[in-house]
Amino acid sequence: MKFSPLLDELIQSLRCLPGVGPKSAQRMAFQLLERDRKAGLKLASALSSAMSDVGHCQSCRTYTEETLCPICASHKRGTSSTICVVETPADVLAIEAGGHFTGRYFVLLGHLSPLDGVGPEELGLALLERHLASGDVAELILATNPTVEGEATAHFIADMARRHKVMISRIAHGVPVGGELEYVDSTTLALSFNGRLPL
């Protein structure tokens, strides 16, 4: 059944969100129209502002509405000689939530995937190479995902960093804290054994 054209457009627009199918989009639209129009207007305003004003940091490529994100603009962290390379801005938030990393970031906005047409240019690796060539980077921490594409991306970047004589490290992969061995997949378990540390 078709509703009004505006309602149909709202439902179809909500479907662009990950994990939102036709029924979920319809429920969201009805919720906003029937019970929470004020929140709907606030959502529309925030979405409009974010779409027009949020761009990428000129240094690390994470999301910001300024030229530099707060980390790169910080006098303490923006001059750190340690850069952590991640695939997405969400990875930055995850690492920041841990509160243990005090350096700066470089966000790839993806990973190498030749079949999908994603090469070094799409990941901004020319900008990363400029950072490495500047002489201001002592260590590059590779925190790409432990997938085939993430590993290939990490190896490509490691080769680039070696040319600039920058120390390279890779975040550890293994058994999660609180995890039980019987539920850990064999690849993760192998990585845990290969990356074991002395006590």
Curated annotation (Swiss-Prot):
Q: Which Gene3D superfamilies does the UniProt entry name for this protein?
A: 3.40.1360.10, 6.10.250.240, RecR Domain 1
Domain called Toprim: residue spans:
81-176
> What's one GO MF term for it?
DNA binding
From which residue to which do the C4-type zinc fingers run?
Answer: 57-72
- Function per UniProt: May play a role in DNA repair. It seems to be involved in an RecBC-independent recombinational process of DNA repair. It may act with RecF and RecO.
Record family assignment = Belongs to the RecR family.
For this entry, the protein name equals: Recombination protein RecR
**Highest classification ranks of the organism:** Bacteria, Pseudomonadati, Pseudomonadota, Gammaproteobacteria, Alteromonadales
